[in-house]
């Protein structure tokens, strides 16, 4: 699929649930209201859409949430998607998870043909982790990471940079990743959902966040490309591959290749835009041609770049969606 700016859209992120067993402070409110189950796409509906997306050129799929592994019978969807990997219809099936249930599901993910998982982990300090996740258990996440590696899954740690909260966690995290053969990707906070003003106060550019690491080690740019927007560096001596996702300080939209399917069947063409089309209604009305028409409409809606800067400047434009509802 080619959008209006000549970008090849071959990557679909599917949010399978807006629910999560954590309440990370930068992702959702502590008292989050979740969608009723009747509003969620069923697994059959997700697979029907996946087959249409594949026909239109999607080659990579990432499962997200919320926390994807808390949805009941998620193994049904994973195994069905795995069949498309094994048949050569998909080049890549991956998942972003908080890791808390990874120990249980690692064997299934590996057998389904998944090669890699991203684990969201912002600190190795148990108390700080509990505070950021609002009650999460660090030990379960670490056990999940080790289980994934034991089943030959590559693991990339996603660490959100939080000013005055986890700046001191970067050096221990870099050491941990290097020692365990994990990639590390650092992510700037984005102005989504309630509490945007608070999130602005916690924002720190990755140039500043990585300063302690740069003071100790040389960084060398890598040609490595993933399906996502990260720029990669080799951290000398550590032998660490470090990715930087910088939506605020270094825009990367020129090479965007992705669209997002929410758990209630909406297609968002950009994380930083409210433009979307609703596929669930067309599915449930039983009009296949409407689904294909809406996909083409969605392509035309994809903006050239995100609108985070203008949203910060004009409070009335700020997005009400929380990250867990979009599948960031």
Q: What annotation goes with each model-predicted range?
A:
Residues 1-11, 179, 189-328:
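Auxiliary Fe-S-binding modules of radical SAM enzymes
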Residues 4-44:
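Canonical Radical SAM [4Fe-4S] cluster-binding loop centered on the CxxxCxxC motif
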Residues 16, 184, 265:
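Residue-level signature of catalytic and energy-coupling elements of molecular machines
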Residues 22, 126-127, 251, 277:
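Glycine-centered loop/turn positions within well-structured domains
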Residues 32-36, 125-132, 193-197, 278-279:
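A short acidic, helix-capping loop that chelates divalent metal ions and anchors anionic groups
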Residues 34, 66-68:
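Glycine-rich, proline-tolerant flexible connector loops at the mouths of alpha/beta enzymes
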Residues 40-63, 70-187:
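Radical SAM/AdoMet-radical enzyme domain recognition
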Residues 68, 160-164, 191, 196-199:
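Short histidine/acidic/glycine/proline-rich micro-motifs that form metal-
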């Amino acid at each position: 699929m080619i959008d209006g700016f000549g970008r090849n859209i071959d990557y679909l992120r599917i949010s399978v649930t807006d629910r999560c067993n954590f309440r990370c402070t930068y992702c959702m409110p502590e008292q989050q209201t979740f969608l009723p189950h009747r509003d969620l796409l069923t697994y059959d509906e997700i697979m029907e859409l996946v087959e249409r997306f594949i026909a239109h050129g999607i080659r990579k799929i990432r499962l997200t949430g919320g926390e994807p592994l808390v949805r009941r019978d998620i193994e049904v969807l994973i195994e069905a998607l795995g069949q498309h990997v094994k048949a050569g219809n998909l080049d890549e099936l991956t998942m972003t998870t908080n890791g808390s249930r990874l120990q249980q599901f690692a064997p299934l993910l590996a057998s389904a043909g998944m090669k890699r998982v991203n684990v969201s982990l912002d600190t190795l300090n148990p108390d700080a982790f509990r505070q950021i996740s609002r009650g999460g258990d660090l030990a379960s996440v670490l056990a999940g990471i080790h289980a994934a590696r034991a089943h030959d899954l590559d693991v990339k740690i996603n660490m959100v940079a939080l000013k005055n909260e986890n700046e001191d966690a970067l050096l221990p995290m870099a050491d941990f990743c290097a020692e365990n053969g994990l990639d590390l990707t650092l992510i700037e906070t984005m102005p989504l959902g309630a509490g945007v003003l608070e999130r602005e106060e916690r924002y720190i550019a990755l140039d500043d966040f990585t300063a302690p690491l740069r003071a100790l080690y040389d960084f060398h740019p890598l040609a490595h490309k993933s399906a996502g927007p990260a720029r990669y560096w080799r951290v000398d001596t550590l032998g660490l591959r470090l990715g930087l996702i910088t939506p605020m300080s270094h825009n990367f939209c020129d090479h965007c290749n992705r669209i997002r399917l929410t758990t209630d069947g909406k297609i968002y063409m950009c994380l930083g835009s409210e433009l979307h089309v609703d596929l669930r209604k067309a599915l449930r009305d039983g009009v296949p041609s409407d689904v294909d028409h809406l996909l083409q409409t969605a392509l035309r809606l994809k903006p050239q770049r995100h609108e985070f800067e203008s949203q910060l400047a004009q409070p009335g434009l700020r997005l009400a969606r929380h990250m867990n509802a979009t599948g960031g």
